[in-house]
């Protein structure tokens, strides 16, 4: 955990430096990059980090991608959710037929991905949170559970679409690896994604 704590402390130094020396075009977007195998360690450590930030005078807010994804699903029409359930059941009943199983899950995941991206449903939830925090001094937003976006979408596209909306320091806890100054590999196996204008620490 010491390496994660070291990375988090370094990231917070960047956050403070950004607040002091940031210029008009700078958006306070930060990524703590960590090995996907440490997802559970991050989840256990997050409350302690949040408490530490509060002790330092920050107004801490947490946005869970997992909860946001669940909310989008819960808001879908009943008939759509029933269709997904039928697809899931069919996949489980045919688990011996690997090809059929893969096809069923592929259809289900495609439907879920469309639900998340249609009218930017998931992105709008994050944007609403960012808007709510705008103008609130000492606020900081911790975005957790980013692994919940797999296999539907990647956070890089969402960050790009929300450029200009980040008015308070926002920290994304990103399971993956760095492959360059601005390139990341989500969960360590997705293709490299360079659509980032944020500050990266760790990885």
Language-model segment annotations:
Residues 14, 118-134:
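A short, acidic, amphipathic alpha-helical segment used as a generic capping/interface helix at domain edges
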Residues 135-152:
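Conserved P-loop NTPase "ATPase switch" module shared by AAA+ and STAND
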Residues 147-203:
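Glycine-rich, aromatic-bearing surface loops/beta-hairpins
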Residues 1-53, 58-62:
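Glycine-rich P-loop/Walker A and Walker A-like loops and their local beta1-loop-alpha1 context
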């Amino acid at each position: 955990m010491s390496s994660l704590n070291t990375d988090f402390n370094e990231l917070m130094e960047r956050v403070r430096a950004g607040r002091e020396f940031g210029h008009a075009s700078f958006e306070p977007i930060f990524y703590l990059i960590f090995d996907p195998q440490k997802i559970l360690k991050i989840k256990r450590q997050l409350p302690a980090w949040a408490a530490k930030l509060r002790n330092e005078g920050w107004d801490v807010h947490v946005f869970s991608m997992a909860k946001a994804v669940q909310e989008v699903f819960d808001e879908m029409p009943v008939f759509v959710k029933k269709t997904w359930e039928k697809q899931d059941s069919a996949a489980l009943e045919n688990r011996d037929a690997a090809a059929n199983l893969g096809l069923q899950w592929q259809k289900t995941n495609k439907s879920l991905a469309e639900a998340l991206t249609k009218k930017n449903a998931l992105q709008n939830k994050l944007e609403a949170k960012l808007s709510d925090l705008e103008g609130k001094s000492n606020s900081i937003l911790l975005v957790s559970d980013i692994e919940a976006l797999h296999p539907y979408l990647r956070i890089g596209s969402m960050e790009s679409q929300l450029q200009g909306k980040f008015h308070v320091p926002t920290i994304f806890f990103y399971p993956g690896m760095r492959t360059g100054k601005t390139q990341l590999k989500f969960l360590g196996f997705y293709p490299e994604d360079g659509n980032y204008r944020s500050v990266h620490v760790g990885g």
